[in-house]
Swiss-Prot record:
The keyword Membrane applies. SUPFAM superfamilies: P-loop containing nucleoside triphosphate hydrolases (SSF52540). The gene is MDR1. It is a multi-pass membrane protein. Its main location: membrane. Glycans are attached at residues 149, 157, 356, 819, 895, 912, 1253. Belongs to the ABC transporter superfamily. ABCG family. PDR (TC 3.A.1.205) subfamily. ATP binds at residues 927-934. Residues 1-37, 1172-1202 are annotated as: Disordered. GO terms for molecular function: ABC-type transporter activity; ATP binding; ATP hydrolysis activity. This is ABC multidrug transporter MDR1. GO terms for cellular component: plasma membrane. The chain crosses the membrane at residues 543-563, 571-591, 636-656, 661-681, 691-711, 798-818, 1231-1251, 1257-1277, 1305-1325, 1345-1365, 1372-1392, 1498-1518. Residues 1-11 have a biased composition (Pro residues).
Length: 1567
């Protein structure tokens, strides 16, 4: 039956509308006059604001302040500017502060009974009170006449558009070939269509108000906040949309006052190596005003301000702790979130928008954060908007207004106190104990909302109907009237803009443009960022030192490689090589400046810090080019010192001329080259959006720079189509300058005169530039003849280099400023082609899909309120959960203790915890932040890899066996999945490998379909997991995580770690109720839960509550309406829990959770002595006794499935290899990137060395072309390792602990899958390089051998990459090691320094380098038996003695077996002798022989086999052995107790014998 268009209920009381109208009118007409200048706030227990009354008026509900508005609109004080007053008074107690007009502020002046010197005003004291501090701050600021900006915001007809569709298709390796058959997509038709994200929003937020933004994920909350702050980045507003700040348009406001409206994103971006104190002091310093109270210095002001915010947000103890990230150890996740909050607070912006900033915070901390926002709004007039997903009633009551979003449509905007009544009068039912915020969000969820009886056909259903109802409501009319008054009060661009400019100008430093949004000048910004750069370097000094040491080691190696180079013509090639090495290593060491993978772990890397710079630019901390310039300034001294040490070593050890003048020229050019290449790499990083883009371009650029330096390919041999690269190559100019600098003015003794017995003018030196009859060769003549270089070019080249340097630095600064933002797009699902569900629509009617509304008289549809609690027998999608196999096993743990050692100091994480989980029960694991909830879960699930665990863990009274982990499910907090797999494939993979082999594949897949129905995943079962924003959303990922564990059919129990983390209230409700259904069907469930609402909390049967230090506070039943739990706490001295209070929040408050929470009662000690604790021990004894008897009765016939894995090795290998093949096939960017790298590099090399002639230089160039092919090796390795890490992370974090498959299978599968693609790559490189370079004249045998070598080389590269990354933690570390090893292999392969010229202690490196055999085999096959035809400058030209022919004169030389060839034997003058006659003679100088081709090929395969075995061995030794095995655990226990020997002895001596280890309690049974 079609529903009627919803209308506002005409028969409903309109008292709320009258009250709202009177509030708006009162607020507008009763505004204070400019004469008053005091803003008073007095504590009260009645109401938070005289305009809005609340149902809950206790302290915890946030109703704690009454506002008397007597401030002046022109002089409302700033919230965070008074801190310096207290620091001055505390440090100089005898100095009375003076005001701007010279008057004194008496030290005994008080405000509401608070003295300035009170410890409650000192953020370093435990008595500090932010509320009182802020009030006194206001008072002093008013006295000194310092103003701050304040403004509200009004938005009318706000519509935001984005690009993207609700669904896209997954690309595969063949997608580019299929594109021509889809012309619509190829031409852009139907691709990235315009999508309306926000529809026609209206509202007004006055200064000092708090707005709560509610909506489900994807409803547009983040976009709304970004629109308010003007941070849309790629999204667009409609022309009709209006946003203004007290009359100032958003365009003008963002241009001149950008930092006055800031947006706090949900993700945290900080420099991990900075401490919390450094991070916040930087933020404070960047926004420190020019006019400060008492004239304090900027440093004192910013330091004190940072201390205040650290105290407010509970960060004082982390002042000297690194912020950290996923890779760098630092503060906890919750503390890092608070750092982000404090950073925003320090910006001093009058408009702040917070996007789910309470995520990851426990309820007590989230409440304190919201209270701090309220104080800021009331005292400082800050306008704040906060999007929040799980808000308690106490948090909700703090807000002034609320906006509710439904699929991008506004369905309510108004005071928080009338919102609930509005929706109830609409016809929706709010269950008891459901918070108002949850209720408001639930009405947007068809699966959760409940219609009142009699309203079933009157309530709106779709988002459009809700919006229509809102626009026709009286509340909307009052809102529009209030907006009209707002606009009348603040006419566009009249007056208020000048006031804002005036106040902003007062805060600006000298030499800052008046219309600049920044408070400090550019030089101050550069200085501040430079100091921060050095702080980051110091914080990561180990990495900096390691990098510098590696560079110095390379200098020592290269220098020693050319040690004692002869000062003869035989040393010409060596001199060119060492200078080539020096200039390349100096220039290319800066490539690390485009590394870091956007994690900000590299101290001065542009791309790594981009998200942080973008954030700070939006906060108006500094210009992006200021940070870029600071990076340059900070980097120059470090580069100078490193270059000095590096070049001293390589210059003097490498045999270059020991002349002070030449050394300083050498150093000058190398240092300028370092800076120039640094500027180029920085520009490349700044101009690209992602690290892979930058690295891909850098790889191509480096190849071009190396080839066209002038050494590997001499200028005269360059082809015109690429020769232009020589003229834009900075390294080429530096190489020419260094080479001519070295040989200028020198003469070198001829090492090979032709003939050696010649005299007078009857001989010549077989070197370019030689003069007949001279026994030495001029260095200037040699470089001019060989390279066309001239000493006259040296200073010209310096000028060109400086020009390059200035140009690229300028471009870098410009690009850094302009290329910051990234485009935003709408979220979408990704499906495999041909697998889109038939009923899937991009914008479907969720109401219809959910089967209509819910009714309050249907018990099966009501949220359960009892502890038995199933909400009927249907899962979220209505399917049964009866497929869960029944369970009978009881898991118990007793006196579990977990100790680890940190920096040599022991630390106890879990302290004698006991409990159990029965089948059919849902047990909650809760605790304060840092209590060890996840740690306990990991310990119970046998997933810890370090430390010592003691205690008893039993299943049915028996010790855990090797099958325990595969018989349990563990839902991790992080939703880790392979991004290329579909939902159904992920579930089938889990079922295939984790269900017993006795179950057929058909049965497994049928069970997977049951799981899909249980979790209501039918609509996206064929969707690809993808990445956030391009794939499954947060809720769908969490469902998949749970589904993967259910698909394994856990026989014992199901562990869950924070299954509701990051979800909105309705999604959390869906997850927890599903767990309730699982428990009701016999599943044993143990779940940690972070911030449960009262209704969610009542779904659990039992609770294990932990305090800090992993100590038990409570373990037992929760009881109906939480009576058992509450009775325990109240019996032992806690305040009674209010009837409307959330028991979960009550518990946290009782034990003193939150940054400033304290409890007078030691609850863990109370528990230890309680009757309930003794009952737990008795019950454990009883359970163990009963299960032991039952085990004895069954004897050895009890059901048991021994074995670590459910499936045999071959089945594991088949499944895993198939999945890895699938992953590669569905990652076309990786495969095509690999193939294009090989194709473009090989073609570029081939056409650079196109058809080289048979001269000696031509042969050398041909050898260099083969050498250049091997340089692809490094880029290939860098591509492979991140792919391996992705697979390994998933395996080690989820699949190995679950015992899905063996680590040996994981390694073999990854090795196997790479091989076909490496074979294809070898074929492409072979065809692209060797045909252009050597032509098609080679025999088929030789071409076949070349192909085999190419394929072998690329297979070696893949196995080498896997060997290096196998045991290392991340791709960055492995990349550094691989690059170093590759450098050694390339250096010692006999091309750049002939083997016979190597110092004796380095010859072994030539023999062990794998590249030696690859180059040897390729070169021998390519150049064997090739006739040498010397170029004119390569010939030894001389006259024979009078009367003799050339042949007669050289007869002795020929008879002695000289390798050369005489071109004019019958001539009597100008004999032309070529030193070589065949390619084999040329190769022989590098000890490359045609006869060794198959030996070299065999050695190559030996290296591949070695790589594979080494991969397995390294992975086992580093990543398997250390984390598994009983002997290692025993060793850990012994080591731990030995480390505690001194402690035990001291305790014994002092009589504290209880500290000594007791056999049972402290050692226990080792697992």
């Amino acid at each position: 039956m079609a529903s009627q268009p919803p209308q506002p209920p005409s028969g409903q009381p309109d008292t709320q509308y009258e009250e709202y109208q009177s509030e708006v009118i009162t607020e507008t007409t009763n505004r204070p006059t400019p004469a008053a200048d005091v803003y008073e706030i007095t504590p009260t227990n009645d109401v938070m604001d005289d305009r809005y009354e609340h149902e809950h008026d206790d302290y915890e509900s946030g109703a704690m302040y009454e506002t008397v508005r007597t401030w002046s609109p022109q002089s409302r004080p700033e919230l965070v500017r008074i801190a310096s007053v207290f620091s001055r008074i505390d440090s100089h107690p005898d100095v009375a502060p003076t005001t701007e007009d010279g008057g004194q502020l008496n030290r005994r002046d008080t405000l509401a009974g608070v003295k300035i010197g009170d410890p409650v005003l000192d953020p370093t004291k435990p008595e500090f009170d932010f509320y009182k501090w802020a009030r006194m701050f206001t008072h002093v600021m008013e006295k000194e006449g310092i103003k701050r900006n304040r403004t509200g915001v009004m938005f009318r007809n706000l519509t935001v558009l984005g690009s993207g569709s609700a669904v896209q298709y997954q690309d595969t390796f063949l997608s580019p070939f299929a594109a021509p058959f889809r012309p619509g997509e190829l031409c852009g038709k139907g691709r990235n269509p315009e999508k309306v994200i926000l529809h026609d929003f209206n509202g007004a937020i006055r200064e000092g108000e708090l707005l709560m933004v509610l909506g489900r994920p994807g409803s547009g909350c983040s976009t709304f906040l970004k629109a308010i702050c003007g941070e849309l980045h790629g999204l667009q507003k409609k022309k009709e949309s209006i946003i203004h700040y007290n009359g100032v348009s958003q365009h003008t406001f963002k241009k001149e006052l950008r930092g006055e409206a800031v947006y706090s994103a949900e993700d945290e971006h900080h420099f991990p190596h900075l401490t919390v104190g450094q991070t916040l002091e930087f933020a404070a310093a960047a926004r420190t005003p020019s006019k400060r109270v008492l004239g304090l210095s900027r440093k004192d002001f910013s330091t004190h301000l940072a201390r205040v915010m650290m105290s407010v947000f509970g960060l004082s103890h982390t002042y000297n702790t690194k912020v950290g990230d996923d890779y760098v150890r630092g503060v906890s996740g919750g503390e890092r979130k608070r750092v982000s909050i404090a950073e925003i607070a320090l910006s001093g912006a009058p408009i702040c928008c917070w996007d789910n900033s309470t995520r990851g915070l426990d309820s007590a901390t989230a409440l304190e954060f919201t209270k701090a926002l309220k104080i800021g709004s009331q005292v400082g007039g800050i306008t704040q908007c906060l999007a929040i997903y799980q808000a308690s009633q106490a948090i909700y009551d703090i807000f002034d207004k609320v906006i509710v979003l439904y699929e991008g449509r506004q369905i309510f905007f108004g005071p928080t106190r009338i919102a609930k009544q509005y929706f109830e009068e609409m016809g929706w039912y709010c269950p008891p104990r459901q918070t108002t915020a949850d209720f408001l969000t639930s009405v947007t969820n068809p699966k959760e909302r409940i219609a009142k009886e009699g309203y079933e056909n009157r309530v709106p259903r779709t988002a459009v109907e809700f919006e229509r109802y809102w626009k026709q409501s009286q509340n909307n009319k009052l809102l529009l009237a209030d907006m009209d008054r707002f606009e009348a009060e603040y006419p566009p661009e009249e007056g208020h803009l000048e006031k804002l400019r005036e106040t902003h100008g007062q805060a600006q430093a000298k030499h800052t443009a008046s219309k600049s949004p920044y408070r400090i000048s550019v030089p101050m910004q550069v200085k501040l960022c430079t100091v921060r750069a050095y702080q980051r370097l110091w914080g990561d000094k180990s990495s900096t030192i390691a990098t510098n040491i590696s560079q110095i080691m390379m200098a020592l190696i290269i220098g020693s490689l050319f040690f004692d180079t002869p000062q003869t013509t035989d040393g010409f090639f060596a001199k060119g090589s060492v200078i080539f090495f020096a200039i390349l290593l100096n220039g290319l060491m800066s490539i690390t400046e485009i590394n870091g993978l956007c994690k900000a772990t590299d101290p001065i890397v542009p791309n790594a810090q981009r998200p942080i710079v973008v954030k700070h630019v939006n906060f108006a901390f500094y210009h992006a080019y200021s940070e870029a310039l600071a990076g340059i300034v900070a980097d120059i001294p470090i580069k100078f010192l490193l270059a000095l040490v590096f070049n001293i070593i390589i210059y003097f050890l490498g045999g270059l001329e020991r002349s002070a003048a030449k050394f300083f020229i050498f150093f000058l050019f190398t240092f300028i080259t370092i800076l120039t290449m640094s500027a180029i790499f920085r520009t490349l990083a700044a101009a690209t959006k992602t690290i892979p883009q930058a690295l891909a371009l850098a790889g191509v650029m480096i190849l071009a720079l190396v080839i066209y330096t002038g050494f590997t390919l001499q200028p005269s041999y360059m082809h015109p189509w690429f020769k232009w690269i020589l003229y834009i190559n900075p390294i080429a100019y530096a190489y020419e300058a260094l080479l001519v600098n070295e040989v200028h003015g020198n003469r070198y003794r001829c090492a090979t005169p032709i003939p050696p017995y010649g005299s007078g003018t009857n001989f010549a030196c077989a070197v370019a530039g030689a003069v007949p009859g001279e026994m030495s060769v001029s260095g200037d003549a040699w470089v001019e003849s060989s390279y066309d270089y001239s000493y006259a070019h040296i200073w010209r080249n310096l000028g060109i280099l400086l020009g390059f340097l200035a140009f690229f630095y300028f471009v870098y600064l410009v690009v850094s400023e302009l290329n910051l933002s990234s485009a935003s797009s709408a979220e979408f699902l990704v499906f495999r082609r041909g697998h889109l569900p038939k009923n899937f629509q991009g914008s479907k009617d969720e109401e219809a899909a959910a089967g209509g509304v819910m009714y309050p008289n249907d018990p099966a549809r009501l949220p359960p309120t009892n502890t038995n609690g199933a909400a009927g027998e249907t899962a979220p999608g209505g399917s049964t959960v009866a497929v869960i196999p029944p369970q009978k096993d009881i898991f118990t743990w007793r006196n579990v203790t977990y100790d680890i050692t940190i920096k040599g100091e022991p630390r106890r994480l879990l302290d004698n915890i006991s409990g159990w989980v029965r089948p059919g029960t849902l047990t909650a694991l809760m605790g304060v932040s840092g209590a060890g909830k996840t740690t306990l879960l990991d310990a119970l699930a046998q997933r810890t890899t370090m430390g010592v665990i003691t205690g008893d863990m039993l299943v049915n009274g028996r010790p855990l066996d090797s099958s325990f982990q595969r018989k349990t499910g563990y839902v991790q907090q992080q939703d880790l999945h392979l991004e290329t797999t579909t939902v159904r494939e992920a579930l089938r993979f889990s079922a295939d490998l984790r269900q017993p082999k006795s179950v057929s594949r058909k049965e497994k897949y049928e069970y997977v379909e049951d799981v899909i129905k249980m979790l209501s995943m039918e609509d996206f079962s064929e969707a690809v997991v993808g990445n956030p924003g391009e794939g499954l959303n947060v809720e769908q990922r969490k469902l998949l995580t749970i589904g993967v564990e259910l698909a394994a059919k856990p026989q014992l129990l199901l562990f869950l770690d924070e299954p509701t983390s990051g979800l909105d209230s309705q999604s959390s409700w869906s997850i927890v109720t599903f767990l309730r259904k699982l428990a009701d069907n016999g599943q044993a469930v143990l779940s940690t839960i972070h911030q449960p609402s009262g209704i969610l909390f009542e779904q659990f049967d039992r609770l294990l509550f932990l305090a800090k230090g992993g100590r038990t506070v409570y373990f037992g039943d929760i009881g109906k309406n939480s009576e058992t739990l509450l009775n325990y706490f109240e019996t032992h001295g806690a305040e009674p829990c209010g009837p409307s209070e959330n028991p979960a929040e009550y518990m946290l408050n009782v034990v003193g959770a939150g940054p400033s929470g304290k409890s007078k009662i030691d609850w863990p000690a109370v528990w230890k002595e309680s009757e309930e604790s003794r009952h737990v021990q008795q019950e454990l004894d009883r359970i163990q006794s009963e299960t032991s008897k039952r085990n004895e009765g069954h004897g050895q016939s009890a059901e048991k499935e021994p074995g670590e894995f459910a499936m045999p090795f071959t089945s594991q290998l088949y499944c895993v290899t198939t999945r890895v093949f699938q992953q590669y096939w569905r990652t076309p960017s990786y495969i095509w990137g690999k193939l294009l790298l090989g194709l473009t590099s090989a073609l570029f090399i081939g056409f650079s060395f196109f058809l080289q002639n048979s001269s000696m230089a031509g042969l050398q160039n041909s050898l260099f072309s083969i050498f250049m092919l091997t340089t692809i090796f490094s880029s290939l390795v860098q591509q492979i390792m991140p792919r391996f890490v992705t697979q390994r992370d998933l395996f080690e974090v989820r699949e190995r602990p679950s015992r899905a498959y063996s680590w040996k299978v994981f390694l073999l599968a990854n090795i196997i899958v790479e091989i076909p693609y490496q074979i294809l790559l070898g074929i492409i490189a072979w065809a692209s390089l060797f045909y252009p370079t050597f032509g098609a004249h080679l025999s088929s045998e030789r071409q076949g051998i070349l192909l085999l070598y190419c394929v072998q080389f690329f297979i070696f590269a893949s196995t080498f990459a896997q060997m290096i990354i196998a045991g290392l933690p991340d791709a960055e570390t492995a990349g550094g090691i691989a690059t170093t090893m590759f450098g050694l292999m390339v250096t010692f392969n006999g091309v750049l320094q002939k083997p016979n010229a190597l110092p004796g202690f380095w010859r072994f490196m030539w023999r062990v380098s794998p590249i030696t055999y690859t180059v040897g085999g390729l070169a021998a096959t390519s150049l064997h038996s090739r006739e040498v035809k010397c170029a004119q400058n390569e010939l030894a030209i001389f006259d024979p003695p009078s009367g003799a022919t050339c042949a007669q004169y050289l007869q002795k030389l020929v008879e002695a077996g000289a390798p050369g060839k005489l071109y004019n034997p019958m001539s009597t003058s100008q004999c032309q002798y070529c030193p070589l006659s065949s390619g084999d003679q040329f190769l022989g100088g590098s000890e490359i022989h045609w006869s060794d081709r198959w030996r070299n090929f065999g050695i190559g395969w030996a290296y591949i086999v070695f790589n594979i075995f080494a991969t397995v061995a390294l992975y086992y030794l580093i990543r398997v052995r250390k984390s598994s095995g009983r002997p290692n655990r025993i060793i850990s226990v012994i080591t731990y107790h030995l480390s505690q020997f001194g402690t035990y002895c001291r305790a014994f001596i002092t009589g504290r014998k209880e500290k000594c280890p007791r056999k049972r309690e402290q050692i226990g049974k080792i697992y």
